[in-house]
Amino acid sequence: MKAIIVLLMVVTSNADRICTGITSSNSPHVVKTATQGEVNVTGVIPLTTTPTKSHFANLKGTKTRGKLCPNCLNCTDLDVALARPMCIGTIPSAKASILHEVRPVTSGCFPIMHDRTKIRQLPNLLRGYENIRLSTHNVINAERAPGGPYRLGTSGSCPNVTSRSGFFATMAWAVPRDNKTATNPLTVEVPYICTKGEDQITVWGFHSDSKTQMKKLYGDSNPQKFTSSANGVTTHYVSQIGGFPNQTEDGGLPQSGRIVVDYMVQKPGKTGTIVYQRGVLLPQKVWCASGRSKVIKGSLPLIGEADCLHEKYGGLNKSKPYYTGEHAKAIGNCPIWVKTPLKLANGTKYRPPAKLLKER
């Protein structure tokens, strides 16, 4: 393969004799120069390498995050992001994060209609922050929210440490206690409660079911309307009544209904609003997140350390300044991608052996 010359050294002599020339043999090194085209030289130093695929690793000198919550056993990153019971734990701070769930599976609490919202992006949104923590307090009093009083619904698929049924800590399933009637759109303000100037990620949603179940739970079997607004972003939804698609990825959860889950990002001091009818999942604990973590697609487990993390090759140690092969996103102390190999000429321009001449 042709290479581009980086440096070419030329040696001259001011001797008063014509000698036999440069002692050399056939040179296998051909470099391509800007002024002389292809040139044979007596020696080169390769500047490029072609990596092979390897395990992903921890980035040297930097905290690297794989799973959002390494100590939350049998929990997907979506479980952690929604704060499913038994999946609440400390998320370690990190300057680099591995996006290892290309299509995050649903949580085991309740069948989620993923395609209606951007909820699959929530774990990746959190992964992009260096510091992430779940608030200790609820953002609103769900039981006394407009349209209440409410009892908080639970799911037998969500047992917690104290009960055989529960629900996500980020949301409250608002089921009317007594006033099971249709309602006009109601509005609740969502205050900013993070304390360190972080972004506040507020999770909310709504539940829908068959006409029979909607009438039983909420007193209204018609489609319900919902709107969220924060940081200049407004989102509208209308609930679907029955006719839900089969979601085999839910692992055979028994519920007949579905929930739609979304989130909004609130900047420091900014209030959000949710306009809702029956079946709302009101926000409770919120995520407080700050700093930036570089995110790269990869896989787990993380084995050892590496200078560079590359989406196609995994963990790389930088042995040369350039590399050839597949070009993809990389983070860390990485070699630079080039299309063709580069070589540094560390010898002279090759000349064939000169014939022996007489002295003058």
Curated annotation (Swiss-Prot):
In natural infection, inactive HA is matured into HA1 and HA2 outside the cell by one or more trypsin-like, arginine-specific endoprotease secreted by the bronchial epithelial cells. One identified protease that may be involved in this process is secreted in lungs by club cells. Palmitoylated. GO terms for molecular function: host cell surface receptor binding. Pfam families: Hemagglutinin. Residues 1-15 form the signal peptide. GO terms for biological process: fusion of virus membrane with host endosome membrane; fusion of virus membrane with host plasma membrane; symbiont entry into host cell; virion attachment to host cell. Glycans are attached at residues 40, 74, 160, 179, 246, 317, 346. Belongs to the influenza viruses hemagglutinin family. This is Hemagglutinin. It comes from Influenza B virus (strain B/South Dakota/5/1989). The lineage of its organism: Viruses, Riboviria, Orthornavirae, Negarnaviricota, Polyploviricotina.
